[in-house]
């Protein structure tokens, strides 16, 4: 009994150790095309290249691949895969990919040619590697990575601005202005403009002629003259007083000078003539003061030029 048991164990050990060796021998016996196109490669045997459908499926699994489908073979053919051998695909028929016609390959046909043969018939196998990322495994591809570039340009925005202001060029217009403004991009540099406005005011000098004829005989005359210049500025009053004083001094000097040469007939005649002349001068000064005050009221903002004064001396006949 023990002998039978030991014999069974010996046979089992021999069988288990021989099986991997046979598998290794089968992998070494397989031949595969040098380059894979779109993951598809042609697989056969070194001694006996032909295999039935089951053997073709097992051969792909031994290589860590799967039996390719017709669509995968067609995709490889469009990428330049071409052979002159029929091979099994997953749909249990054999195909041959052709790019150029050849009488010896696929009966001078083009494309993926199909042969519906029984599964027992022997052909090579088309295996597919799903981990391939290159079109041709023999030609490494340079992968260029494009990083997204953020667009920092602000999209242009149109907005309508309605203004109730009138056009500056047509002040009489009553139609409100409606303007459409397009906002520029942030990247574009904004243009800077400078506007210089020069306002020139041309004023015509106003000549105010003031004629002063004065001969002051008493303090009452000064009061009447001051009342006549009520609407004139203080500076003009001061100038008028100065000219009055100068005129009075000149008049006194003149009278003293000519009294010695031509004595007066009577003091009463001299006094009457002086009083008559002073009254006329006061009336003329009142008229001039009223005209000057009217001009000042009409144009209060106009520039006033310094007045021109004329001094007339009083001549008294004796």
UniProtKB/Swiss-Prot annotation:
Its main location: membrane. PROSITE patterns: LINK_1, LINK_2. Residues 284-318 are annotated as: Disordered. Residues 256-318 are cytoplasmic. GO terms for biological process: cell adhesion; glycosaminoglycan catabolic process; hyaluronan catabolic process; positive regulation of cellular extravasation; receptor-mediated endocytosis. SUPFAM superfamilies: C-type lectin-like (SSF56436). O-glycosylated. It is a single-pass type I membrane protein. Disulfide bonds join 60-127, 84-105. Residues 24-234 are extracellular. Residues 284-305 have a biased composition (Basic and acidic residues). GO terms for cellular component: cell periphery; plasma membrane. The chain crosses the membrane at residues 235-255. It comes from the Eukaryota. The keyword Nuclease does not apply. Residues 39-129 form the Link domain. Homodimer; disulfide-linked. Interacts with PDGFB and IGFBP3. Forms a transient ternary complex with PDGFB and PDGFRB in TGN. PANTHER family: HYALURONAN RECEPTOR, LYMPHATIC VESSEL ENDOTHELIAL HYALURONIC ACID RECEPTOR 1. Ligand-specific transporter trafficking between intracellular organelles (TGN) and the plasma membrane. Plays a role in autocrine regulation of cell growth mediated by growth regulators containing cell surface retention sequence binding (CRS). May act as a hyaluronan (HA) transporter, either mediating its uptake for catabolism within lymphatic endothelial cells themselves, or its transport into the lumen of afferent lymphatic vessels for subsequent re-uptake and degradation in lymph nodes. This is Lymphatic vessel endothelial hyaluronic acid receptor 1. It comes from Mus musculus (Mouse).
